[in-house]
From Swiss-Prot:
Gene3D superfamilies: Nucleic acid-binding proteins. The keyword Ribonucleoprotein applies. It comes from Staphylococcus epidermidis (strain ATCC 35984 / DSM 28319 / BCRC 17069 / CCUG 31568 / BM 3577 / RP62A). NCBIfam families: PRK06676.1 (NF005208). One of its GO terms (molecular function) is mRNA binding. This is Small ribosomal subunit protein bS1. CDD domains: S1_RPS1_repeat_ec1_hs1, S1_RPS1_repeat_ec2_hs2. The lineage of its organism: Bacteria, Bacillati, Bacillota, Bacilli, Bacillales. Binds mRNA; thus facilitating recognition of the initiation point. It is needed to translate mRNA with a short Shine-Dalgarno (SD) purine-rich sequence. Keywords: Repeat, Ribonucleoprotein, Ribosomal protein, RNA-binding.
Length: 392
């Protein structure tokens, strides 16, 4: 009768059952729990108290706490009619954690978790069990030192669940990407052509500079970096430098933003206001020849036009008869059109006119003194047929 009674009592609670009870004792390596409706007390070994590593059971429970756990084993001493339920609180926590995480994965939801440890390959986080954020899934940006996350609560998404292999992979990078996409959409909606905004140089390429304008990058083409000619972006800007940029265009569909630093700077013409005046004689450099004249640079990126009629006192058929690119010349400012940013120049006005007159006179005298009869005009050349009908 006694044996039948004991077996029936034991069979009331079976291995795999979920039980609840109150913590009676907290010892160094285990916790004693009074099981509701149980014949014996329950024992939770320290290794089965938590999904995290603990040194002492008192870190997670105290006397009087109500706990829930799975029965993993039943120990019974028939001779002394004593026994105990071996319990696992950790197994139940892990199961609940997987159910929670699976729901978040299915719904593509963001969760928060505390970083409990920083390891070489990434971050260990508490998600009701040990979760791992690999280094490649920590951020959209390069982060050299992961220790900045130690103890922080971070926003993450479930990337992979594998209960059989106790594998929980999470991603902080996926959340950052969502936030970046939302921020980009907001910025694209708020930007208008002509806006002048602050930014920071994010990276340089051979064709321009990418500027971070609040989480979104826009491109300043190399031709829009400066009013002066630029070979490489490094000549003008450096990574991390704060700059002002003007929005040239916004393509929302392709998420492309064209920017200009040049348009936020004074024009070369504005920089010379008050420096040059009409009738000033200054030095310049011939930069380009055209059939109607020569363009002369008188200040960095400031050019004026010397019309072909203002190149020399004597008639020339083409500017390249007397000028060439790179040549240094003196020019006189004939006029400054500030509204259209044009400057009229003259080389002729800086040349002594007397030299030209003497040259013309010398040519005439040489011609008159030439004894070559072949070059001299005859009376017939001068008067033609006017005397053909006269009789003498």
């Amino acid at each position: 009768m006694t044996e039948e009674f004991n077996e029936s009592m034991i069979n009331d609670i079976k291995e795999g059952d979920k039980v609840t009870g109150e913590v009676q004792q907290v010892e160094d390596k285990q916790v004693v729990v009074h099981i509701n409706g149980g014949k014996f007390n329950g024992i939770i070994p320290i290794s089965q108290l938590s999904t995290h590593h603990i040194e002492n059971p008192s870190e997670v429970v105290k006397v009087g706490d109500e706990v829930e756990a799975y029965v993993t084993k039943i120990e019974f001493d028939e001779e002394n009619d004593t026994g105990a339920y071996i319990l696992s609180k950790r197994q139940l926590e892990t199961e609940k954690s997987y159910e929670y995480l699976q729901e978040k994965l299915d719904n593509d939801e963001v969760i928060e978790a505390e970083v409990t440890e920083v390891v070489k390959g990434g971050l260990v986080v508490d998600v009701g069990q040990r979760g791992f954020v690999p280094a490649s899934l920590i951020s959209t940006d390069f982060i050299e030192d992961f220790s900045v996350f130690d103890g922080q609560t971070i926003r993450i998404k479930v990337e992979e669940l594998d209960p059989e292999n106790n594998r929980v992979i999470l991603s902080r990078k996926a959340v950052e990407q969502l936030e970046n996409d939302a921020k980009k959409a907001s910025i694209l909606d708020s930007l208008n052509e002509g806006d002048v905004i602050d930014g920071k140089v994010a990276r340089l390429t051979n064709f321009g500079a990418f500027i971070d304008i609040g989480g979104v990058d826009g491109l300043v083409h190399v031709s829009e970096l400066s009013h002066e000619h630029v070979q490489t972006p490094e000549e003008v800007v450096s990574v991390g430098e704060a700059v002002k940029v003007k929005v040239k265009s916004v393509e929302k569909d392709s998420e492309r933003i064209s920017l200009s630093i040049k348009d936020t700077l004074p024009t070369p013409f504005e920089n010379i206001k008050g420096k040059f005046h009409e009738d000033d004689v200054i030095e310049g450099t011939v930069v380009r020849l055209a059939n109607f004249g020569a363009f002369v640079e008188i200040a960095p990126s400031v050019q004026g036009l010397v019309h072909i009629s203002e190149i020399d006192h004597k008639h020339i058929g083409s500017p390249n008869e007397v000028l060439e690119p790179g040549q240094q010349v003196n020019v006189k400012i004939l006029g400054i059109d500030e509204d259209n940013e044009r400057i009229s120049l003259s080389i002729k006005a800086t040349l002594p006119k007397e030299n030209v007159i003497e040259s013309d006179a010398s040519t005439t005298q040489s011609y008159l003194e030439d004894d070559n009869d072949e070059d001299k005009p005859t009376l017939g050349d001068v008067f033609g047929d006017k005397f053909k009908d006269l009789k003498f």
